[in-house]
Regions:
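Noncatalytic modules at the cell exterior or secretory-pathway interfaces
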Residues: 84-85, 159, 342-350, 383-401, ...
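Extracellular/virion structural assembly segments
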Residues: 1-199, 276-283, 289-295, 417-494
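Short tryptophan-centered beta-strand motifs in secreted/extracellular beta-sheet-rich domains
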Residues: 269-271, 338-370
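Secretory/extracellular carbohydrate-interaction modules
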Residues: 207-324
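Extracellular carbohydrate-recognition regions
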Residues: 150-152, 177-234, 410, 420
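Extracellular/lumenal carbohydrate-interaction signature centered on repeated Trp-anchored short motifs
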Residues: 257-269, 335-343, 466-468
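Flexible glycan-contacting loops in extracellular carbohydrate-active proteins
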Residues: 369-412
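Short, aromatic/His-centered strand-loop micro-motif at the edge of beta-sheets
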Residues: 315-346
Length: 494
């Protein structure tokens, strides 16, 4: 029989094995009973599935075949292997399931360590379930989707729904009682799209964009000289700066401009771009908004000015009619991001009457079990008390720049989306879900995203997150004919 290795967060040490005879704990139910005088036997008060705390006995093979190591080398490798502040995947190499586990010490490793060495690692399971390594998914047909959970316990699901048309709500239900919904389905309320798109572009081609060779305003925060060019990525999913198209000292870059489908007074605009921090370098990015006189009225930018560090800052500014620039938002990335190789940045600027609202957040798909997560969210408002920034808006431009001969941090523009905001009557229903939107509902983490933005504020009162039972479950989607829905799940075991 082959020796069984231990796999932690997808990694293993080739010389570390599980000692034979280890008994895997399962089915950790405890029943609490109470004796009632005058009645035979007892009555059940509670039955609970408890967590686990147990030791896993491990063996270090320390010989010429595995490569000899001294005590400190072994200890340091083992500490790195198990040192996590969050629960991570714990798997045994001969099994087709994993736990989400914490690890505790102490590690007691003998100083004289030739041959085979034994020690224990303490495993803490606050989540008592085992999860199948291979996931499952099924696509809805005629607004119904079947889920077959081959495990021995109910399991949470992930719902992904692509809107084929605008909609005021999305609901997925299990039977007559369990359902989850975002939006408002009250038919007595008037329904209209109060935030129609006036520009949507996902950086797939330069069609509709005009390359700019001159610039008539000064942005000292995230701007610079123009004249360079963008490249469309091979995947046709982003624009990025052609570094060979610009030269000279200081900030030099490329700018492309595009008009809205109509002029707008109140508006909201969101820009989305990716940062590759693994390659250290300096970079600037900005999206500029233009008024009806073709003057810049706002900039939405990002800068990493130090070519040897990864400390980015989001900066949003407004321009008056004379071109004077005022910063209304400045937010440095949370230090927890400094060690990430890459992530996606979203910045949204909204003008409603005399109030400007800026919201930024980051997004990433984290490793297995794969979870989509929005994080480092931050929001701030600015009141235009003097009505200096109230001109109608008609166009925007995208700008990305490098600094002289310094290394460039790769920045990929993924898309820009601008909507006009129309007056909305009290209690009216809005088309909060637009054609093409991707809804993600994670029942395990209680996380709701629409286009990678947290959407928990739109969760309908009375709806709840739910699990699917072991065996077969039928789920129903409403409204009918509007969404292309896929449900993902992992079989779960006691």
């Amino acid at each position: 029989m082959r020796n069984e290795t231990i796999i932690v967060n997808g990694k293993k040490l080739k010389w570390l094995f599980v000692e034979r005879g280890f008994k895997i704990p399962s089915f950790n139910y405890t029943t609490t009973t109470e004796k009632v005088p005058g009645r035979p036997g007892t009555i059940k008060k509670a039955r609970d599935l408890e967590g686990y705390e147990f030791d896993v006995p491990l063996i270090v093979r320390n010989d010429y075949l595995a490569g000899r190591k001294d005590h400190d080398d072994i200890l340091n490798e083992v500490v790195k292997f198990f040192d996590y502040d969050e629960p991570v995947k714990l798997q045994f190499s001969n099994k087709k399931w994993y736990w989400n586990a914490y690890f505790d010490g102490p590690f007691e490793i003998v100083s004289n360590n030739d041959g085979f060495i034994t020690f224990n690692v303490q495993v803490i399971l606050t989540d008592p379930y085992k999860y199948a390594i291979d996931g499952n998914q099924n696509t809805a047909i005629s607004d119904a989707v079947s889920v077959v959970n081959a495990g021995t316990a109910e399991t949470p699901i992930i719902v992904e729904a692509r809107a084929l048309q605008n909609s005021n709500y999305y609901m997925i239900s299990k039977g007559d009682e369990d359902y989850f919904m975002i939006g408002d389905d009250d038919l007595d309320k008037p329904l209209k799209d109060y935030s129609p798109l006036i520009l949507e572009d996902e950086a797939r081609s330069f069609s509709g964009w005009n390359k700019q060779n001159t610039i008539d305003f000064t942005d000292n925060q995230t701007g610079g000289k123009v004249g360079g060019s963008f490249i469309v990525s091979d995947s046709k999913q982003s624009f990025y700066l052609n570094n060979d198209s610009v030269s000279g000292n200081g900030w030099n870059g490329a700018m492309y401009k595009r008009s809205f489908s109509k002029q707008a007074q109140d508006f909201t605009t969101t820009v989305k771009f990716g940062i590759n921090q693994k390659n250290k370098g300096a970079v600037r990015f900005a999206q500029y908004i233009y008024d009806s006189d073709n003057r810049v009225i706002a900039s939405i930018g990002y800068t990493n000015p130090n070519a040897k560090q990864a400390i980015g800052t989001i900066i949003v500014t407004l321009f008056d009619q004379s071109g004077n620039q005022q910063t209304i938002y400045k937010y440095k990335n949370n230090p927890s991001l400094y060690k990430l190789d890459s992530f996606v940045v979203y910045i949204r600027l909204t003008r409603k009457d005399d109030v400007f609202t800026v919201k930024s957040w980051k997004y990433k798909e984290f490793p297995y079990p794969l979870r989509k997560k929005a994080f480092d969210e931050h929001e701030r408002q600015f009141v235009d008390g003097g009505n200096f920034y109230q001109r109608p808006v008609v166009a925007l431009s995208l700008y990305s720049a490098k600094n002289g001969s310094n290394n460039v941090m790769p920045l990929y523009i993924f898309g820009t989306y601008t909507r006009e905001l129309l007056p909305r009557p009290i209690n009216a229903r809005d088309m909060i879900i637009k054609k093409g939107d991707l809804i993600t509902i994670d029942m395990a983490t209680k996380n709701v995203l629409v286009n990678e933005e947290s959407f928990l504020s739109e969760k309908t009162f009375g709806s709840n997150y739910f699990n699917v039972d072991k065996g077969h479950t039928e789920l129903v989607i409403n409204p009918p004919g509007i969404f292309d829905t896929t449900v993902k799940w992992q079989d779960r075991f006691l």
